[in-house]
C-alpha cells in the first residue's frame, strides 16, 4: 500500500493491483481511494509493506491525527502525536505542574469511582452478575483511593465477566488478554490524542508516574473507559470469533468501535 497526499486528501493506492494484468479493469479502478485528512482521528499502520510519504505524516499531525504502528502480530508498538496541539499549551502545562496534592488525589478518587461504576454497568449488562458490592465500593472510594478499592473491584470484576477457565487479567496471559491488550492500546492512543489537542502534557500523570512512560496522564484518563473495551471483547467472544489470534476481522471490529471515541 502506498499512502500519499493530493489536494489535502489522503490517497491510498495499491500499486501491485494496478500492475497486475490478470485483474479486470473494474477491479483496478478501485485500487485507489481518497479520504479527507480532516476527517481522520487515528491511523493504524498494520502491514510491513506500507509506504507513507512525509507529506502525509505532516498533514495528519497538523490535523491532530494519532498515527499508530503495529508489529508482525498486529499489536500497536508505536504512537506519533503532534508536538503542538493547542494555542494555550504553555498555560495548561503550568496549571498541571502547579496542581496541589489534594487536588491530584481528588482527581484520582473521581477517576477510580467512575471506573468501578462503569465496570459494574458492564458486568451487569454482559454477565448479568450482582453488582451491589461494586456500587458500594464506588461510593466508598476515598481521596487518592487510599483503601485501594480499585484493586478489590477489579478482582471481583474479572472473576465474573468472562468466566473462562484459567483466565486472569494479565498482559501476557491466555486469550482474550490479547484482545484486551489491543483494545487498550488503541484507547490509549485516542486518549493521548485528546490530551494533546487540549493542550495538556500527557507525560505528567495524576497517579501513574513511571519515569519511562511518556503517556502517564493518558493511562490515568483512560481508566474509566477500559470497561468499554471489555464490553467489545465480550461481544466478540459471544459472536464466536477466534480469539487465539488477533485477526484482521477482530482488529477491524475494535477500530470501528473506537471511531466514536476518536471524534470526541
What is each stretch, according to the model?
Residues 211, 232-252:
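Accessory, usually C-terminal, subdomains that scaffold auxiliary metal cofactors
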Residues 1-32:
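N-terminal, Lys/Arg-enriched amphipathic/low-complexity engagement segments
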Residues 221-233:
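A structural-propensity feature for long, helix-poor, extended segments
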Residues 99-173, 179:
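Internal, conserved structured core segments that host functional sites
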Residues 179-185, 189-193, 197-201:
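Conserved mixed alpha/beta catalytic, RNA-binding, or beta-rich assembly cores of soluble enzyme
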Residues 208-217:
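Small-residue-rich helix-loop
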Residues 253-260:
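Conserved small/polar residues in nucleotide/adenosyl-binding loops
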Amino acid at each position: 500500500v502506498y499512502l500519499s497526499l493530493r489536494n489535502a486528501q489522503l490517497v491510498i493506492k495499491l500499486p501491485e493491483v494496478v500492475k497486475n494484468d490478470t485483474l479486470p479493469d473494474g477491479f483496478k479502478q478501485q485500487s485507489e481511494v481518497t479520504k479527507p485528512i480532516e476527517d481522520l482521528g487515528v491511523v493504524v499502520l498494520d502491514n510491513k509493506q506500507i509506504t507513507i510519504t512525509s507529506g502525509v505524516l505532516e498533514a495528519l499531525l497538523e490535523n491532530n491525527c494519532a498515527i499508530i504502528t503495529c508489529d508482525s502480530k498486529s499489536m500497536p508498538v508505536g504512537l506519533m502525536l503532534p508536538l503542538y496541539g493547542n494555542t494555550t499549551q504553555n498555560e495548561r502545562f503550568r496549571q498541571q505542574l502547579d496542581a496541589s496534592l489534594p487536588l491530584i488525589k481528588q482527581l484520582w478518587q473521581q477517576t477510580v469511582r467512575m471506573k468501578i461504576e462503569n465496570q459494574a454497568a458492564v458486568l451487569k449488562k454482559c454477565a448479568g452478575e450482582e453488582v451491589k458490592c461494586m456500587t458500594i465500593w464506588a461510593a466508598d472510594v476515598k481521596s487518592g483511593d487510599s483503601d485501594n478499592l480499585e484493586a478489590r473491584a477489579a478482582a471481583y470484576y474479572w472473576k465474573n465477566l468472562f468466566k473462562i477457565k484459567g483466565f486472569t487479567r494479565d498482559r501476557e496471559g491466555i486469550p482474550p488478554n490479547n484482545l484486551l491488550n489491543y483494545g487498550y492500546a488503541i484507547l490509549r492512543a485516542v486518549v493521548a490524542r485528546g490530551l494533546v489537542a487540549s493542550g495538556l502534557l500527557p507525560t505528567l500523570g495524576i497517579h501513574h508516574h513511571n519515569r519511562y512512560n511518556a503517556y502517564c496522564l493518558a493511562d490515568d484518563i483512560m481508566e474509566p473507559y477500559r470497561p468499554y473495551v471489555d464490553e467489545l471483547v465480550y461481544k466478540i467472544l459471544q459472536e464466536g470469533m477466534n480469539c487465539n489470534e488477533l485477526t484482521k476481522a477482530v482488529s477491524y471490529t475494535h477500530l470501528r468501535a473506537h471511531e466514536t471515541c476518536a471524534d470526541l
